[in-house]
Design a protein with these regions (language model features):
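N-terminal glycine-rich anion-binding loop in soluble enzyme alpha/beta folds
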Residues: 3-62, 67
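Alpha-helix boundary/capping residues
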Residues: 51-54, 75, 149, 218
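Local beta-strand N-terminus motif with an aromatic residue
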Residues: 1-2, 80
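Mixed-charge interfacial surface used for oligomerization/domain docking
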Residues: 3, 9-23, 27-28, 91, ...
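A general structural signal for short secondary-structure boundary/capping elements
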Residues: 49-54, 72-73, 130-132, 273-274
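A short glycine/small-residue-enriched secondary-structure motif
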Residues: 43-47, 78, 100-105
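Glycine-rich phosphate- or other oxyanion-binding loops that anchor nucleotides, phosphorylated ligands
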Residues: 55-56, 62-93, 97-98, 143
Length: 276
Protein backbone atom coordinates (compact mmCIF):
# COMPACT_ATOMS: atom_id res chain seq x y z
CA UNK A 1 0.00 0.00 0.00
CA UNK A 2 1.20 3.49 -0.89
CA UNK A 3 0.11 6.22 1.54
CA UNK A 4 -0.07 9.92 0.66
CA UNK A 5 0.92 12.73 3.03
CA UNK A 6 0.83 16.48 2.48
CA UNK A 7 0.48 19.62 4.60
CA UNK A 8 -2.22 22.24 5.01
CA UNK A 9 -0.77 24.56 2.37
CA UNK A 10 -2.26 22.12 -0.15
CA UNK A 11 -5.73 23.51 0.65
CA UNK A 12 -7.38 20.14 0.07
CA UNK A 13 -10.90 20.27 1.55
CA UNK A 14 -11.43 17.93 4.48
CA UNK A 15 -14.07 15.84 2.71
CA UNK A 16 -11.75 15.13 -0.22
CA UNK A 17 -8.86 14.31 2.09
CA UNK A 18 -11.07 11.80 3.87
CA UNK A 19 -12.46 10.36 0.64
CA UNK A 20 -9.02 9.73 -0.85
CA UNK A 21 -7.28 8.84 2.44
CA UNK A 22 -4.84 11.75 2.35
CA UNK A 23 -3.02 12.54 5.61
CA UNK A 24 -2.55 16.28 6.17
CA UNK A 25 -0.09 17.82 8.64
CA UNK A 26 -1.26 21.29 9.77
CA UNK A 27 1.10 24.24 9.56
CA UNK A 28 1.60 26.85 12.27
CA UNK A 29 0.74 30.53 12.62
CA UNK A 30 2.21 32.57 15.48
CA UNK A 31 -0.26 35.20 16.74
CA UNK A 32 0.88 37.46 19.58
CA UNK A 33 3.52 34.90 20.50
CA UNK A 34 1.07 32.00 20.58
CA UNK A 35 1.36 29.14 18.08
CA UNK A 36 -1.92 28.02 16.51
CA UNK A 37 -2.55 25.29 13.95
CA UNK A 38 -3.76 26.38 10.54
CA UNK A 39 -7.46 25.62 10.16
CA UNK A 40 -7.60 23.81 13.53
CA UNK A 41 -7.19 26.30 16.37
CA UNK A 42 -8.57 29.27 14.41
CA UNK A 43 -10.83 29.30 11.38
CA UNK A 44 -9.60 30.96 8.23
CA UNK A 45 -12.57 33.34 8.23
CA UNK A 46 -11.83 34.53 11.75
CA UNK A 47 -8.13 34.87 11.01
CA UNK A 48 -8.61 37.04 7.91
CA UNK A 49 -11.18 39.19 9.72
CA UNK A 50 -8.68 39.84 12.50
CA UNK A 51 -5.58 40.24 10.34
CA UNK A 52 -6.00 43.95 9.39
CA UNK A 53 -6.37 45.00 13.04
CA UNK A 54 -3.53 42.97 14.54
CA UNK A 55 -1.00 45.32 16.14
CA UNK A 56 1.83 42.81 15.74
CA UNK A 57 2.07 41.08 12.39
CA UNK A 58 1.60 37.32 12.73
CA UNK A 59 4.33 35.04 11.46
CA UNK A 60 4.29 31.61 9.91
CA UNK A 61 6.19 28.60 11.17
CA UNK A 62 6.85 25.11 9.91
CA UNK A 63 5.45 22.15 11.79
CA UNK A 64 8.20 20.23 13.57
CA UNK A 65 9.89 17.26 11.97
CA UNK A 66 8.54 15.31 14.94
CA UNK A 67 4.98 15.84 13.71
CA UNK A 68 5.93 14.37 10.35
CA UNK A 69 7.77 11.46 11.94
CA UNK A 70 4.73 10.69 14.08
CA UNK A 71 2.50 10.78 11.01
CA UNK A 72 4.79 8.44 9.07
CA UNK A 73 4.97 5.99 11.99
CA UNK A 74 1.17 5.83 12.25
CA UNK A 75 0.81 5.12 8.54
CA UNK A 76 3.38 2.32 8.63
CA UNK A 77 1.60 0.83 11.64
CA UNK A 78 -1.61 0.83 9.57
CA UNK A 79 0.08 -1.17 6.82
CA UNK A 80 1.64 1.35 4.46
CA UNK A 81 4.65 0.01 2.57
CA UNK A 82 5.68 3.31 0.98
CA UNK A 83 4.79 6.92 1.77
CA UNK A 84 4.80 9.80 -0.70
CA UNK A 85 5.03 13.08 1.21
CA UNK A 86 4.24 15.98 -1.14
CA UNK A 87 4.92 19.56 -0.09
CA UNK A 88 5.38 23.22 -0.99
CA UNK A 89 8.60 24.28 -2.75
CA UNK A 90 11.72 24.10 -0.62
CA UNK A 91 12.71 27.62 -1.77
CA UNK A 92 9.49 29.09 -0.36
CA UNK A 93 9.06 27.18 2.89
CA UNK A 94 10.79 25.10 5.52
CA UNK A 95 8.08 22.44 5.25
CA UNK A 96 10.04 20.34 2.77
CA UNK A 97 13.05 20.40 5.10
CA UNK A 98 11.03 19.31 8.13
CA UNK A 99 9.46 16.43 6.23
CA UNK A 100 12.85 15.40 4.80
CA UNK A 101 14.43 15.37 8.26
CA UNK A 102 11.64 13.11 9.53
CA UNK A 103 11.91 10.82 6.51
CA UNK A 104 15.55 9.99 7.25
CA UNK A 105 14.43 7.63 10.01
CA UNK A 106 12.61 5.45 7.46
CA UNK A 107 15.13 5.13 4.64
CA UNK A 108 13.71 4.83 1.14
CA UNK A 109 10.25 3.91 2.45
CA UNK A 110 9.38 7.63 2.58
CA UNK A 111 9.82 9.83 -0.48
CA UNK A 112 9.56 13.56 0.13
CA UNK A 113 8.60 15.44 -3.02
CA UNK A 114 8.85 19.14 -3.88
CA UNK A 115 5.60 19.94 -5.71
CA UNK A 116 6.90 23.24 -7.10
CA UNK A 117 3.50 24.69 -6.19
CA UNK A 118 1.32 25.97 -3.37
CA UNK A 119 -2.36 25.81 -2.46
CA UNK A 120 -4.36 23.69 -4.92
CA UNK A 121 -1.59 23.85 -7.50
CA UNK A 122 -0.06 21.36 -5.08
CA UNK A 123 -3.37 19.99 -3.86
CA UNK A 124 -4.42 18.80 -7.30
CA UNK A 125 -1.14 16.89 -7.62
CA UNK A 126 -1.86 15.20 -4.30
CA UNK A 127 -5.45 14.37 -5.22
CA UNK A 128 -4.43 12.86 -8.55
CA UNK A 129 -1.89 10.47 -7.05
CA UNK A 130 -4.08 9.63 -4.06
CA UNK A 131 -6.78 8.36 -6.41
CA UNK A 132 -4.24 6.18 -8.21
CA UNK A 133 -2.84 4.87 -4.93
CA UNK A 134 -6.30 3.74 -3.83
CA UNK A 135 -6.63 1.86 -7.12
CA UNK A 136 -3.46 -0.06 -6.32
CA UNK A 137 -1.30 1.51 -9.02
CA UNK A 138 2.46 0.93 -8.99
CA UNK A 139 4.86 3.49 -7.58
CA UNK A 140 6.30 4.20 -11.04
CA UNK A 141 2.82 4.87 -12.45
CA UNK A 142 1.99 7.18 -9.57
CA UNK A 143 5.24 9.13 -9.89
CA UNK A 144 4.72 9.53 -13.65
CA UNK A 145 1.27 11.01 -13.10
CA UNK A 146 2.60 13.28 -10.35
CA UNK A 147 5.19 14.73 -12.71
CA UNK A 148 2.60 15.20 -15.45
CA UNK A 149 0.21 17.11 -13.19
CA UNK A 150 3.09 19.13 -11.74
CA UNK A 151 4.07 20.35 -15.20
CA UNK A 152 0.49 21.37 -16.00
CA UNK A 153 -0.42 23.06 -12.69
CA UNK A 154 -0.76 26.83 -12.53
CA UNK A 155 -1.53 29.24 -9.68
CA UNK A 156 -2.22 32.92 -10.43
CA UNK A 157 -3.60 35.50 -8.00
CA UNK A 158 -4.50 39.15 -7.68
CA UNK A 159 -3.62 40.74 -4.33
CA UNK A 160 -5.82 43.50 -2.96
CA UNK A 161 -2.83 45.41 -1.61
CA UNK A 162 0.96 45.22 -1.40
CA UNK A 163 0.87 45.98 2.34
CA UNK A 164 1.13 42.38 3.52
CA UNK A 165 3.76 41.46 0.95
CA UNK A 166 5.78 44.41 2.21
CA UNK A 167 5.45 43.16 5.79
CA UNK A 168 6.72 39.75 4.73
CA UNK A 169 9.81 41.25 3.08
CA UNK A 170 8.99 39.79 -0.33
CA UNK A 171 9.44 43.17 -2.05
CA UNK A 172 11.30 46.31 -1.13
CA UNK A 173 9.65 48.67 1.34
CA UNK A 174 9.72 51.52 -1.18
CA UNK A 175 7.98 49.54 -3.90
CA UNK A 176 5.34 48.26 -1.51
CA UNK A 177 4.77 51.74 -0.10
CA UNK A 178 4.32 53.24 -3.56
CA UNK A 179 2.00 50.40 -4.56
CA UNK A 180 -0.12 50.95 -1.46
CA UNK A 181 -0.40 54.69 -2.11
CA UNK A 182 -1.44 54.08 -5.71
CA UNK A 183 -3.88 51.32 -4.72
CA UNK A 184 -2.33 48.96 -7.24
CA UNK A 185 -3.62 45.40 -7.53
CA UNK A 186 -0.53 43.25 -8.17
CA UNK A 187 -0.66 39.89 -9.96
CA UNK A 188 1.61 36.99 -9.09
CA UNK A 189 2.11 33.50 -10.44
CA UNK A 190 3.75 30.54 -8.73
CA UNK A 191 5.55 28.18 -11.07
CA UNK A 192 8.35 25.70 -10.36
CA UNK A 193 8.80 27.15 -6.90
CA UNK A 194 9.24 30.71 -8.13
CA UNK A 195 6.94 33.66 -7.41
CA UNK A 196 6.68 35.63 -10.64
CA UNK A 197 5.27 39.14 -11.08
CA UNK A 198 2.58 39.47 -13.75
CA UNK A 199 2.18 43.24 -13.41
CA UNK A 200 -0.66 45.11 -11.79
CA UNK A 201 -3.91 46.96 -12.44
CA UNK A 202 -5.22 50.20 -10.98
CA UNK A 203 -8.64 48.98 -9.90
CA UNK A 204 -10.14 45.80 -8.52
CA UNK A 205 -12.76 45.70 -11.27
CA UNK A 206 -10.11 45.81 -13.98
CA UNK A 207 -8.08 43.32 -11.98
CA UNK A 208 -10.89 40.77 -11.97
CA UNK A 209 -11.30 41.22 -15.72
CA UNK A 210 -7.57 40.66 -16.19
CA UNK A 211 -7.63 37.58 -13.98
CA UNK A 212 -10.36 36.14 -16.18
CA UNK A 213 -8.29 36.87 -19.29
CA UNK A 214 -5.27 35.11 -17.79
CA UNK A 215 -7.38 32.03 -17.10
CA UNK A 216 -8.82 31.96 -20.62
CA UNK A 217 -5.31 32.06 -22.11
CA UNK A 218 -4.46 28.73 -20.52
CA UNK A 219 -6.88 26.87 -22.76
CA UNK A 220 -8.84 23.70 -21.94
CA UNK A 221 -8.63 22.81 -18.25
CA UNK A 222 -8.69 19.53 -16.36
CA UNK A 223 -9.13 20.96 -12.87
CA UNK A 224 -10.09 24.39 -11.52
CA UNK A 225 -10.30 26.01 -8.09
CA UNK A 226 -11.12 29.64 -7.41
CA UNK A 227 -8.97 30.85 -4.52
CA UNK A 228 -9.65 33.74 -2.18
CA UNK A 229 -8.78 35.23 1.19
CA UNK A 230 -12.16 36.07 2.74
CA UNK A 231 -13.61 37.19 -0.60
CA UNK A 232 -16.04 34.34 -1.17
CA UNK A 233 -18.70 36.45 -2.90
CA UNK A 234 -16.16 37.70 -5.44
CA UNK A 235 -14.84 34.16 -5.89
CA UNK A 236 -18.27 32.70 -6.61
CA UNK A 237 -19.19 35.57 -8.92
CA UNK A 238 -15.90 35.07 -10.77
CA UNK A 239 -16.64 31.38 -11.22
CA UNK A 240 -20.18 32.00 -12.46
CA UNK A 241 -18.93 34.64 -14.93
CA UNK A 242 -16.66 32.25 -16.81
CA UNK A 243 -17.74 31.60 -20.41
CA UNK A 244 -15.20 28.85 -21.01
CA UNK A 245 -15.79 25.13 -20.44
CA UNK A 246 -15.37 24.77 -16.68
CA UNK A 247 -14.06 21.37 -15.50
CA UNK A 248 -16.36 19.20 -13.39
CA UNK A 249 -16.56 19.90 -9.66
CA UNK A 250 -14.72 23.24 -9.47
CA UNK A 251 -13.73 24.27 -5.96
CA UNK A 252 -14.02 27.63 -4.18
CA UNK A 253 -11.44 27.77 -1.39
CA UNK A 254 -10.54 30.27 1.31
CA UNK A 255 -6.82 29.61 1.22
CA UNK A 256 -4.48 28.57 3.99
CA UNK A 257 -3.53 31.22 6.54
CA UNK A 258 0.13 30.32 5.99
CA UNK A 259 -0.08 31.84 2.51
CA UNK A 260 -2.73 34.45 3.28
CA UNK A 261 -0.56 35.98 6.01
CA UNK A 262 1.79 37.15 3.25
CA UNK A 263 -0.88 38.16 0.72
CA UNK A 264 -3.55 39.71 2.95
CA UNK A 265 -7.35 39.59 2.90
CA UNK A 266 -9.52 40.12 -0.20
CA UNK A 267 -7.15 38.35 -2.56
CA UNK A 268 -8.61 36.49 -5.53
CA UNK A 269 -7.05 33.93 -7.84
CA UNK A 270 -7.19 30.46 -9.26
CA UNK A 271 -5.38 27.15 -9.28
CA UNK A 272 -5.76 24.97 -12.33
CA UNK A 273 -4.40 21.97 -14.13
CA UNK A 274 -4.23 22.39 -17.90
CA UNK A 275 -5.73 19.51 -19.83
CA UNK A 276 -3.12 17.11 -21.17
Amino acid sequence: MIAIVTDSTSDIPDQLAEQFQISIVPNVIVIDGQSVLDGKDISREEYYNRLPTMKVSPTTATSSSGMYQEMYEKLFEKGAETILSIHAPRVLSGIFGAASAAAQAFGDRVRVIDSGQITLGMGYQVLAVAQLALQGASLDTILALLESVRQRARVIAMLDTLEYVQRSGRVSWARARIGTLLHLKPFVEVRDGQVLSLGETRTRRRGIEHLRELLYRLGPLERLAILHTNAEDDARQFLSSLTMDVPPDPLVVNITTVIGTHTGPNGLGFATVIRA
